[in-house]
Every structure is written in structure tokens, then in C-alpha cells.
């Protein structure tokens, strides 16, 4: 009971000796007292030590076991206390890893008299030498002590832990030093020289060796390259790398993408990361690149500008008209409203080939817009500049020296008349001597009678005239060079006549009129007599002009506003016997105005005759007979399928309708031609009604056999004030209201209008939507929520009901 430290040390020595005698490798450390009430707990350990000593004495019969037990006892007696104090934690780990089942089996064998025993470590070593799988050590942890049998905790020695850490640090430093010495041992120092540097033969030998190695490496590389080419390995490798290179996303894939920033916002040498701009789920459009930081900066700048609230009226403010790229800025009036009316102007540009963009295209477009804006007339005057003695190339292009026009006046030696033969196409022999146009610039022209007689004889010999050339006056306007008519020009200075330009115009007009008259002559070439009459008419007209007209007015035609207005009206044909159809000849001949006004009711075939023409009074009767012979015998009947008015007009022309309007017009008509027309219609009516009025009071005596298969399909439809077709019920209601003079009430009218609106909505409904447009509303909701779906939560009853809570 009152044991001291000496007695406790002897017990521990005895315990360790017994454990060594059993041949076990594990050592049981001494249990230190944890509390005063557990200081006599070691008596149990002494009893267990006695059992171990008994077993050791039984095994001590053998020599080897006895020797091992003595050595273990001596070792434990010498160093037992020191080990227990230095390494308590290590012994605890070994004690926890001990297999209690194996120890029990070993103790049972020892008690049965088997003297040989091996530990698990030794058994595993033997099994490893034999190539067998080592045994597994089942570490069975002892249960923690209970309240009745507590287990003493191990004492932690901080000095031992510190010494262990210092030893580990020393070992690590030694290992690092050893590795460093091994690495530096291969490097030569400055004091050590190679032997081949001082010896020439050694240097030559080394150089030859290096050259041989180099040649051998080149041969090997060449051989490998030939083998690759022979088997196609290099081609396959190149194709593989090329395919990988093409599959990689590179700068060429950026061509055509839009960057939604101004190009001047990117500074040179600055790296900017662009990402795809977010857009709606249902939004379809091209991808746009933006930078998040730049977007935030632009938004912040805009907010700053809005916060400033600058005054709008700045009459003397001068904004910078040039931007950073030395380009002219567009200036607009009331620019503060541009963004509100036109929306925010986007600043963007497109990437070109290779993902590059220099902004050249945007600047060109801006220059074009500026030029278009500056095309308007400006009040800015040109600034002063130094006068130059020479013209610039641009001014030389615009400079054109006016050429003085000298009038060529012929001598009035011989005047010839225009003949039909002059209009014949020239032959090869007549090309040089032919007349290319009028060379005579005189006023009055005297016609030679001999020339006229020759013209008449030629016309009689060849009544069929050749087709004249076109009425293009460009041939007559040609000017022949001075070499051809050098003798015709006067030697002195040319005498310019008054109003020469006007006279020249009149001559050209007269020439065109003659060409048109000869064209009429070609149309009447089938009759020689008619050609002769036209020639005589021309002759008489020319003679009459020579006798009656003034010499100043010869060969001219007088134009005034009235004649031009009447000529441009053209022919306005009017149908009917009392119409005012034009004669075959033109109404614009001033010589026959009075005669035409007297005989305006004569008929004509309405043949188109454009231009100026003159006819003698003696021949007027012949032309009237000619025109009367070409009139149509039957009048034109109006087309019935054009409408009810055309059908009534047809009945009126045939005399089937008896109208009082025509009878009144017959009595009160101021024109003489109207009664004759009415009389003809009345006469026709009498002839047509000769048999119809006789059967008027008789009735039908027989059926219409030709109408046996006729079954009329009558469909009566009524429409309202908006043009909508009414149903039979609605039509009856409308007629009833109109007859009785009353209408529907307010409620009925509103219900009817609501029903009509619903029908109109149903007709206007899209084929892919409901009448109320719920599909469009669904798409708008998805666009607002930025999701491709919509969540329907709860029912209509629960959503509409009012929830009452306490």
C-alpha cells in the first residue's frame, strides 16, 4: 500500500523482463497516476507481471529463449526508465496496433507447451521472402476507460517534441546540402581548364569528332525525311496540323461583325476585350460586339450630361466644327430635339477582313453626307485669293472660247422651185452635184415659168412619185464648207439683213410644209389626175401669193397665240349627224377660215391630216364630194355591255323609246342640223312601231318557245349604310323601321354594334392567333421576362378571389 518510487521501478523492471521473455516486441509503458485516488492501481499490473514471469520461466527451458530473455531483461533494466520518459507516444501507437487475437493464440500455444513463436512483423518478413501476401494487422483500439476503471492518459513531454523537430530540421538541411553539392559538382570552375584548349592535337581531334557527329545527325535527319516522304507520313502530319489550324477560331472569323462603339473611342495601343451583346430570347438579329466597361462609361457620360441641364439658348456659342480625326462635324439646328425625334443615333462600325477596322469607310460615308448637305446654295462668299497669270488645268476644262459665227449670204442670181424630182434619192453620179440643202438666204423667190412647165411634164410622164425623205430638217440645216462654194461668196464684207434669224425660221417652216404636202402627194400616187391637181393647186397658190402678198411677207407664215392654241387642240371627233367633224383639209388655213365657218356642218371621214395645207375655192366642191363618198352607210352602234346607259342609247338610236326631250329639242333647237337628226329618228320610230303598236292591245297569243329552258335566278340583296350585306332578318327589320318610322332602342343597338365588332375582329383575325390576340400578348410577355416560356401559377378562381386573413 505504501509503495515508494523504488518499489514501483522494480515492478516495472520485472514487467518488462517478463514481456521480453515471451519474445514479444511490444512494450507496455508504465501507467502514471492521474489522480490521488488511483495511486494504488498498479497492484493489478504487478499480478499481470507475475503471470508473464511464470510463462517466461516455463519457456526458459530452452537455451535460445533464455538468452533472449536475459538480454531483454538487461536492456530493459538499463534503459527502461529513459524510454518510458522519452517516447511515450510511440509506445502507445505500437500498443494500439497490437493484435490481441494473435497474442491470445500465442499465449495459448505457449501454455500448451509450444516453445517457438513469431511476431506478425517477422511473419510478414518471411512471407515477403517467400513471395506471399503479407498478413494484415488489425489494429483493435481499446475502449476508453469507464468511470469505475479509468485509463491514465499519456504524458506529453514538450522538450522531447522540440528535440524531435530540431532533429528533423537538421536532417532536411543536410539532405538539401547534399543535393546541391551533387548538382554543382558537375560544373567546372574558372580555375579548371579543359585539356584540349592547350593541346593542338587534342583540339583538332575534338573538332573532327564534333564534325562527324554533326554529319551523322544530318544524315539521320535526311534519312528520316526521305522515309516520311516515301510512306507519306509528312503529308499526313501537315494535313492534320493544317486541319487543326483551320478549325481554330481565328481573326478571319471576325469579318463582318458589328462593333457597337464609335471607332474613335478605341485608343491606339490599348487592349479592349469585346463580348457578344445580350439580346432578347425572341429577338432575331446579327451578333453585336460590345465592351461592358465602355458601355458603362457611355451611360455614365450621358447621365452626367443630363444632370448638367445646360441652358438651351446659346446664341453666341461656337462649337468645335472639327473632330479628333480632322473631319468636319455636321451642324444641325435645334440639335437638342434630334435624339427625341429620330432616336439615339447608334455609333457602330464593321470589322473588315482579318478583324481589322481603320474607319476609312465610315469617314468616306460621312464625307459623302457632308457634300450632299453642302450642295444647297450657301451665302458664304469666296475668300480673297491671289490672281494667277495662267489658268489651272481645272479652269482650262471649264474654259471655252466662243466662236464667232459668220453668216453666209448667197447672191440672188438664180432661184429655183422645189420639185417632186428633187426629193428622189440621189444616184451615185448625182452625189457630187446634188443639193444638200437650201443655200439661198433671200427673202422673196421668183419662180421661173419654164421650170414649172418642166415639173408638170415630168409629173405627167411619171405620175407615181417616189417616196420622199423624212421631214427631218437636219439636212437642210447643213452648212457646206467654204471650199465647195468659194465662188458664191461675195468678195466684199457680208451684208447682214434685218431679222435674219426670224426669216430663216420662216423659211425652214415653209420647207417643212412643202415636204408634208409632197408626202400627201405620195399617198395619192394611185391617181395621176389627183397628182396633177395638187401641182396646179401649188402653182395657183404661189401665183396668188406673188400677186397679192407684200414682198416682205413672201415665203413666210404668221403665227399668233390663237392659231397655235387651235392647232395644238388636234381633232376632237363628235359622233352624230349634227356633229362638227373636220374636213379632210386642215382647218388652220387662214385663207379659208370664213368659208369653213359657213360650211362647218359638212361631213368627213375623219382622216388624220396634220400640218398646214391650202386649197382653192374652186376645188372645194370636188373635195366635198370625195369626202362624202367615203362616209360610212351605217352608224356606229354603242356597245350594250358597258352598262344601262349604253343600252338606253341603243334603244334611243333604234327608235324604241319615245322621249319628250327630243321633241322639245326639235322645236327649240337653234341649230339647223338638229331637226334633221330628230326627224330621222322619228321616222325610224314610226317604221319600227308600225307593227309593235298594232299588237300593243292584243296581248301575247303564243308562248316564247325559245325561252322554254330559261330559268331566271333572281337574288335580291340589301346592304346597310356601310356597304355590308344584310341577312333577311336584318333587311326586314330595316324595311319595317323605315315603314313605321321608328327604330330600335339603345340597348339593342349597342348589342348589335358589339356583335358586328366581334364579327369584324373575327374576320381580321390572324390565322396563327386568337381573336383577342393572346399569342401576341404571350410573345410580348416572354420578351419582357426574357424567357422562352411563361409560368402559369394557380387557377383563375384562386387568382380572382379576394383572400381574407385575420
Curated annotation (Swiss-Prot):
Pfam families: HIND (PF19252), SART-1 (PF03343). There is a cross-link at residues 125, 133, 141, 147, 188, 277, 329, 336, 400, 414, 554, 654, 663, 690, 705, 715, 729, 755, 764, 781, 786, 797 (Glycyl lysine isopeptide (Lys-Gly) (interchain with G-Cter in SUMO2)). Residues 58-101 have a biased composition (Basic and acidic residues). Residues 451-461 have a biased composition (Acidic residues). Residues 1-121, 418-505, 578-610 are annotated as: Disordered. Residues 32-42 have a biased composition (Basic residues). Residues 104-119 have a biased composition (Low complexity). GO terms for cellular component: Cajal body; catalytic step 2 spliceosome; Golgi apparatus; nuclear speck; nucleoplasm; nucleus; U2-type precatalytic spliceosome; U4/U6 x U5 tri-snRNP complex. Keywords: Coiled coil, Isopeptide bond, mRNA processing, mRNA splicing, Nucleus, Phosphoprotein, Spliceosome, Ubl conjugation. The modification Phosphoserine is found at residues 321, 348, 481, 527, 597, 602, 604, 627, 767, 795. The modification Phosphothreonine is found at residues 189, 431, 701, 770. Sumoylated with SUMO2. There is a cross-link at residue 141 (Glycyl lysine isopeptide (Lys-Gly) (interchain with G-Cter in SUMO1)). It is found in: Nucleus. One of its GO terms (biological process) is positive regulation of cytotoxic T cell differentiation. Residues 157-231, 495-540 form a coiled coil. Plays a role in mRNA splicing as a component of the U4/U6-U5 tri-snRNP, one of the building blocks of the spliceosome. May also bind to DNA. PANTHER family: SQUAMOUS CELL CARCINOMA ANTIGEN RECOGNISED BY CYTOTOXIC T LYMPHOCYTES (PTHR14152), U4_U6.U5 TRI-SNRNP-ASSOCIATED PROTEIN 1 (PTHR14152:SF5). Belongs to the SNU66/SART1 family. Identified in the spliceosome C complex. Component of the U4/U6-U5 tri-snRNP complex composed of the U4, U6 and U5 snRNAs and at least PRPF3, PRPF4, PRPF6, PRPF8, PRPF31, SNRNP200, TXNL4A, SNRNP40, DDX23, CD2BP2, PPIH, SNU13, EFTUD2, SART1 and USP39. Interacts with UBL5. This is U4/U6.U5 tri-snRNP-associated protein 1. It comes from Rattus norvegicus.
Amino acid at each position: 500500500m505504501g509503495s515508494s518510487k523504488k518499489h514501483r521501478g522494480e515492478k516495472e523492471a520485472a514487467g518488462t523482463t517478463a514481456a521480453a521473455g515471451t519474445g514479444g516486441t511490444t512494450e507496455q509503458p508504465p501507467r502514471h497516476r492521474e489522480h490521488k485516488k488511483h495511486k494504488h492501481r498498479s497492484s493489478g499490473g504487478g499480478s499481470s507481471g507475475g503471470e508473464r514471469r511464470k510463462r517466461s520461466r516455463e519457456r526458459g527451458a530452452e537455451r535460445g529463449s533464455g538468452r533472449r530473455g536475459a538480454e531483454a531483461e538487461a536492456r530493459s533494466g538499463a534503459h527502461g526508465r529513459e524510454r518510458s520518459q522519452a517516447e511515450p507516444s510511440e509506445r502507445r501507437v505500437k500498443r494500439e496496433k497490437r493484435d490481441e487475437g494473435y497474442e491470445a493464440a500465442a499465449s495459448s500455444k505457449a501454455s500448451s507447451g509450444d516453445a517457438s513463436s513469431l511476431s506478425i512483423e517477422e511473419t510478414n518478413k518471411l512471407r515477403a521472402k517467400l513471395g506471399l501476401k503479407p498478413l494484415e494487422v488489425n489494429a483493435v483500439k481499446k475502449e476508453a476507460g469507464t468511470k469505475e476503471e479509468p485509463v491514465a492518459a499519456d504524458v506529453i513531454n514538450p522538450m522531447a517534441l522540440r528535440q524531435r523537430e530540431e532533429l528533423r530540421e537538421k536532417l532536411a538541411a543536410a539532405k538539401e546540402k547534399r543535393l546541391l553539392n551533387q548538382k554543382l559538382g558537375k560544373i567546372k570552375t574558372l580555375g579548371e581548364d579543359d585539356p584540349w584548349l592547350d593541346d593542338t592535337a587534342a583540339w583538332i581531334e575534338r573538332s573532327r569528332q564534333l564534325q562527324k557527329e554533326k554529319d551523322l545527325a544530318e544524315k539521320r535527319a535526311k534519312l528520316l525525311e526521305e522515309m516520311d516522304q516515301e510512306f507519306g507520313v509528312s503529308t499526313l502530319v501537315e494535313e492534320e496540323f493544317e486541319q487543326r489550324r483551320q478549325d481554330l477560331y481565328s481573326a478571319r472569323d471576325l469579318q463582318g461583325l458589328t462593333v457597337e462603339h464609335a471607332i474613335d473611342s478605341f485608343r491606339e495601343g490599348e487592349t479592349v476585350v469585346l463580348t457578344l451583346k445580350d439580346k432578347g430570347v425572341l429577338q432575331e438579329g446579327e451578333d453585336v460586339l460590345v465592351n461592358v466597361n465602355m458601355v458603362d462609361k457611355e451611360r455614365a457620360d450621358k447621365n452626367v450630361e443630363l444632370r448638367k441641364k445646360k441652358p438651351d439658348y446659346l446664341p453666341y456659342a461656337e462649337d468645335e466644327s472639327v473632330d479628333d480625326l480632322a473631319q468636319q462635324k455636321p451642324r444641325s439646328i435645334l440639335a437638342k430635339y434630334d435624339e427625341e425625334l429620330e432616336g439615339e443615333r447608334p455609333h457602330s462600325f464593321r470589322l473588315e477582313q482579318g478583324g481589322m477596322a481603320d474607319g476609312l469607310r465610315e469617314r468616306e460615308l460621312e464625307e459623302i453626307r457632308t457634300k450632299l448637305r453642302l450642295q444647297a446654295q450657301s451665302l458664304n462668299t469666296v475668300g480673297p485669293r491671289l490672281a494667277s497669270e495662267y489658268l489651272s488645268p481645272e479652269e482650262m476644262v471649264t474654259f471655252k472660247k466662243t466662236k464667232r459665227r459668220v453668216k453666209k449670204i448667197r447672191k440672188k442670181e438664180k432661184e429655183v422651185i422645189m420639185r417632186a424630182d428633187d426629193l428622189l434619192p440621189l444616184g451615185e453620179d448625182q452625189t457630187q452635184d446634188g443639193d444638200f440643202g437650201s443655200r439661198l438666204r433671200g427673202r422673196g423667190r421668183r419662180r421661173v415659168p419654164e421650170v414649172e412647165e418642166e415639173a408638170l411634164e415630168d409629173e405627167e410622164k411619171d405620175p407615181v412619185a417616189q417616196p420622199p425623205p423624212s421631214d427631218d430638217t437636219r439636212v437642210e440645216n447643213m452648212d457646206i464648207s467654204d471650199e465647195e462654194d468659194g465662188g458664191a461668196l461675195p468678195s466684199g464684207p457680208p451684208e447682214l439683213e434685218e431679222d435674219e434669224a426670224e426669216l430663216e425660221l420662216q423659211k425652214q417652216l415653209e420647207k417643212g410644209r412643202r415636204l408634208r404636202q409632197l408626202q400627201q402627194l405620195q399617198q395619192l400616187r394611185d391617181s395621176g389626175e389627183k397628182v396633177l391637181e395638187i401641182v396646179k393647186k401649188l402653182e395657183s397658190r404661189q401665183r396668188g401669193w406673188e400677186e397679192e402678198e407684200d414682198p416682205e411677207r413672201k415665203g413666210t407664215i404668221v403665227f399668233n397665240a390663237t392659231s397655235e392654241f387651235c392647232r395644238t387642240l388636234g381633232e376632237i371627233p363628235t359622233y352624230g349627224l349634227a356633229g362638227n367633224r373636220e374636213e379632210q383639209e386642215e382647218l388652220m388655213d387662214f385663207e379659208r377660215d370664213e368659208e369653213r365657218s359657213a360650211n362647218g356642218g359638212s361631213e368627213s371621214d375623219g382622216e388624220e391630216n396634220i400640218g398646214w395645207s391650202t386649197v382653192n375655192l374652186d376645188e372645194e366642191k370636188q373635195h366635198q364630194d370625195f369626202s362624202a363618198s367615203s362616209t360610212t352607210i351605217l352608224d356606229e352602234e354603242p356597245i350594250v355591255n358597258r352598262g344601262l346607259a349604253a343600252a338606253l342609247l341603243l334603244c334611243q338610236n333604234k327608235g324604241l323609246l319615245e322621249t319628250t326631250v327630243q321633241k322639245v329639242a326639235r322645236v327649240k333647237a337653234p341649230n339647223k342640223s338638229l331637226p334633221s337628226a330628230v326627224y330621222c329618228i322619228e321616222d325610224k320610230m314610226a317604221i319600227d312601231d308600225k307593227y309593235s303598236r298594232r299588237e300593243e292591245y292584243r296581248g301575247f297569243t303564243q308562248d316564247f318557245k325559245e325561252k322554254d329552258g330559261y330559268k331566271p335566278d333572281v337574288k335580291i340583296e340589301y346592304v346597310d349604310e356601310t356597304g355590308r350585306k344584310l341577312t333577311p332578318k336584318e333587311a326586314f327589320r330595316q324595311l319595317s323601321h323605315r315603314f313605321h318610322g321608328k327604330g330600335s332602342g339603345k340597348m339593342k343597338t349597342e348589342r348589335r354594334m358589339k356583335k358586328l365588332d366581334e364579327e369584324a375582329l373575327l374576320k381580321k383575325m390572324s390565322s396563327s392567333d386568337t381573336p383577342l390576340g393572346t399569342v401576341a400578348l404571350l410573345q410580348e410577355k416572354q420578351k419582357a421576362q426574357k424567357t422562352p416560356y411563361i409560368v402559369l401559377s394557380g387557377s383563375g378562381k384562386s387568382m380572382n378571389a379576394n383572400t381574407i386573413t385575420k
